Amino acid sequence: MNYLDLIIKEYISIVEMLQGVYEVESNRIVIEREVFRDYLEKYAYMTFSAKTKVYKALNFIIHDSNNYTMPYKDTELKKTVRKVIINYSTYQEVKKLYETNANI
């Protein structure tokens, strides 16, 4: 199995687990950095920083430059904090493509 297959399978499984726990809001799942790190470090076929680079490049997460997080207005804390934002629309497209057989 190649790295792209591993990354995609891992991404799909992570989002499926997250959507059972977190609310999908505006095609986004907002999670804490520690939660994201725990999921990405579970399978050590690549380092955390290498995986976040790939996630950013493939638009799996919504981020600002030079980081894997985005400022997010936390309504409970009433302040802006940095969170990981999973791009749910990318997940839907990737999952559909990954599970569809090409009739070539």
Residue ranges and their predicted role:
Residues M1-I104:
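Extended alpha-helical interface modules used as scaffolds for assembling large macromolecular complexes
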